[in-house]
Amino acid sequence: MAKLHDYYKDEVVKQLMSQFDYNSVMQVPRVEKITLNMGVGEAIADKKLLDNAAADLAAISGQKPFITKARKSVAGFKIRQGYPIGCKVTLRGERMWEFLERLITIAVPRIRDFRGLSAKSFDGRGNYSMGVREQIIFPEIDYDKVDRVRGLDITITTTAKSDDEGRALLAAFKFPFRK
């Protein structure tokens, strides 16, 4: 079992119950899923780029990514409906906790010129979204085998009812928010 999950059950639940005066343990917000998305717009010209992006995402997440397709045709971007233009992975359970632990302890500190994550990236319902400019911050990616530096979107979906609850949950995990 992931250390972060044990830490959540032992420490974070007690901390949040006292902070928000919950009556039941089930009211305490928890991390539901983590979604990783990599948009590869250049895949229109070269399909190999999408395969490489999917391989990178598989290495980062530990599971096979789902290829996303264009919902509608856009002439300005030269894409048609149904063209493969990206890939995404939804992590739940044990893999989610392991990824979150790696993200907080290893990947985020390796971001260049890092001054903390924005605390304003909550959506109003306690879910947090962030973008990473380089996939090479993850130790699973071999720097020498990278054909192109790509970014990815990371969305942490929680059961929190408000942004304050979601922020308190992630802050309890020692998420490096900007002061």
UniProtKB/Swiss-Prot annotation:
Q: Name one GO molecular function term.
A: rRNA binding
Gene name linked to the record = rplE
Q: Any S-S bridges, and between which cysteines?
A: none
Superkingdom of this protein's organism: Bacteria
Q: Does the keyword Transcription apply?
A: no
* Binding partners and assembly: Part of the 50S ribosomal subunit; part of the 5S rRNA/L5/L18/L25 subcomplex. Contacts the 5S rRNA and the P site tRNA. Forms a bridge to the 30S subunit in the 70S ribosome.
* Name recorded for this polypeptide: Large ribosomal subunit protein uL5
The record's GO CC annotations read: ribonucleoprotein complex; ribosome
Transmembrane domains' residue ranges? none
Q: What does this protein do?
A: This is one of the proteins that bind and probably mediate the attachment of the 5S RNA into the large ribosomal subunit, where it forms part of the central protuberance. In the 70S ribosome it contacts protein S13 of the 30S subunit (bridge B1b), connecting the 2 subunits; this bridge is implicated in subunit movement. Contacts the P site tRNA; the 5S rRNA and some of its associated proteins might help stabilize positioning of ribosome-bound tRNAs.
The alphabetized list of GO BP terms reads: translation
Please state the span of the N-terminal signal peptide per the UniProt entry: none
Q: Which UniProt keywords apply?
A: Ribonucleoprotein, Ribosomal protein, RNA-binding, rRNA-binding, tRNA-binding
InterPro entries associated with the record: Ribosomal_uL5, Ribosomal_uL5_bac-type, Ribosomal_uL5_C, Ribosomal_uL5_dom_sf, Ribosomal_uL5_N
Record carries keyword Chloroplast: no
Q: Which family does it belong to?
A: Belongs to the universal ribosomal protein uL5 family.
